[in-house]
């Protein structure tokens, strides 16, 4: 395989893609043997993989440099044409669900393919194609807005990722100032953020009602492929977190306040765990990767092979820089069987969390790269977190490589942060339910929810 920077990018000819795809769907519909259907499915997967490969290469390069006009235009191209591909996939999944060789296909590919097909059929309609294009456009607008941050702080011009280490400063005044600088950026752009979100909520409600749903909650569950649980079960889970995790979270925060000698934690104290300073990796990005190679080789032959593949082919872009999108993610370049990890290293313990969390996603999809059908490259959205969170803890025995004398400090902070995330995570989930159940709320009313 070539290095990522050398991978060719060619914009797909959407009309040719649609014609080739529909030809295979017609073969699938009209097949008189199981083998003929299986061959059509193989070809459909080939077409989808080719389009996904170009889409992901363009998306990665755009997120690495959001100011690159060429890949900005390519992202816009896929924003506009992705729903057209969803339309022909809808035809494929409908034909699949109605196959007269369904039992044979289940024996060959498993029942999960048909569960996914059912959810994708039920979450799509030709009536919402233009809405989906607009939704994609809103997502891209949001990414550009966040990446545009140029915050004057400590005599430097910083983006949001570069500002983050100051939120863990041992100087409380610096932590407070960093928080204010972050929120000043948000406040200065509040109208833009509010409009993007308000437009998205109303657009999603419109899509849901067009398809016969009461609101976006039902459609959202289908799009997330939540096939094993309902809103009622999720509400019960939130109650369990409230009853069992929140009391523990309160104790963790109380101990944190005591360690810091504070009567009460403020929002700008939450990321600061120790009066002696938070644990940090003891080297730069190259040093972290070199130790990552050692760690994954010692963890298992399989993880060693995987991480060597990632480093050899430069399938990671890790350091924060101007114009780069925020956050971190893992994606998959199907035609090369190659995961890609995107991150924003900033000298905090979060750099190691990314090295393990996103590598958990990447190792999972690398292990699944030879699946017969594209739908099995990834688990469903939330099931995927099993692999990433597991890798964070599988690698605990090697944390000494990165944190040296601060290893136990890191382990405590890491475990405590994992527990503290649970109340936050379910609060976000409950907020989403509230927002989509009452799409008529104004931005101000949402903020008060």
Which residues does each predicted region cover?
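A well-structured
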Residues: 1-278
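Post-HExxH zinc-binding segment in Zn-dependent metallohydrolases
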Residues: 243-244, 368, 379-408, 414-416, ...
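Auxiliary, metal-adjacent structural segments of Zn-dependent hydrolase domains
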Residues: 259, 275-336, 348-349
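Short beta-alpha connecting loops at secondary-structure transitions
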Residues: 340-344, 371-381, 410-417, 435-436
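Active-site recognition of the HExxH zinc-binding catalytic motif
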Residues: 343-368, 388, 393, 431
């Amino acid at each position: 395989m070539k290095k990522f920077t050398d991978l060719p990018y060619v914009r797909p000819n959407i009309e040719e893609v649609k014609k080739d795809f529909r030809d295979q769907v017609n073969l699938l519909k009209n097949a008189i043997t199981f083998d003929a259907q299986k061959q059509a499915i193989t070809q459909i997967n080939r077409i989808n993989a080719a389009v996904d490969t170009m889409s992901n290469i363009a998306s990665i390069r755009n997120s690495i440099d959001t100011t690159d006009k060429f890949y900005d235009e390519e992202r816009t191209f896929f924003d506009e044409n992705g729903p057209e591909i969803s339309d022909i996939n809808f035809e494929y999944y409908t034909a699949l669900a109605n196959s007269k060789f369904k039992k044979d296909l289940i024996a060959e590919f498993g029942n999960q393919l048909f569960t996914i097909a059912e959810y994708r059929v039920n979450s799509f309609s030709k009536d919402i194609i233009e809405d989906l294009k607009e939704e994609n456009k809103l997502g891209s607008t949001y990414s550009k807005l966040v990446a545009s941050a140029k915050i004057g702080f400590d005599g430097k011009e910083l983006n949001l990722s570069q500002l983050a280490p100051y939120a863990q400063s041992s100087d409380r005044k610096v932590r407070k100032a960093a928080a204010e600088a972050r929120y000043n950026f948000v406040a200065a752009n509040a109208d833009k953020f509010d409009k993007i979100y308000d437009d998205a909520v109303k657009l999603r409600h419109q899509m849901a009602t067009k398809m016969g749903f009461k609101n976006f909650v039902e459609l959202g569950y289908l799009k997330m492929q939540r096939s094993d649980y309902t809103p009622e079960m999720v509400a019960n889970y939130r109650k369990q977190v409230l009853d069992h995790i929140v009391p523990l979270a309160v104790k963790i925060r109380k101990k944190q306040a005591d360690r810091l000698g504070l009567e009460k934690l403020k929002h700008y104290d939450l990321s600061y765990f120790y009066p002696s300073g938070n644990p940090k990796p003891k080297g730069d990005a190259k040093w972290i990767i070199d130790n990552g190679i050692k760690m994954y080789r010692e963890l298992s032959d399989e993880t060693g092979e995987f991480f060597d593949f990632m480093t050899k082919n430069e399938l990671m872009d890790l350091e924060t820089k101007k114009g780069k999108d925020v956050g971190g993610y893992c994606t998959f370049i199907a035609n090369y069987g190659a995961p890609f990890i995107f991150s924003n290293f900033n000298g905090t313990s979060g750099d190691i969390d990314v090295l393990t969390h996103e590598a958990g996603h990447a190792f999972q999809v690398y292990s699944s790269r030879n699946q017969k059908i594209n739908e099995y490259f990834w688990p469903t959205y939330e099931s995927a977190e099993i692999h990433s969170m597991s890798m964070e803890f599988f690698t605990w025995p090697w944390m000494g490589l990165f944190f040296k004398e601060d290893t136990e400090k890191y382990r405590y902070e890491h475990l405590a942060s994992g527990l503290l995330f649970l109340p936050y995570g379910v609060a976000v989930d409950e907020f989403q339910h509230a927002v989509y159940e009452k799409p008529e709320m104004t931005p101000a009313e949402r903020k008060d929810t």
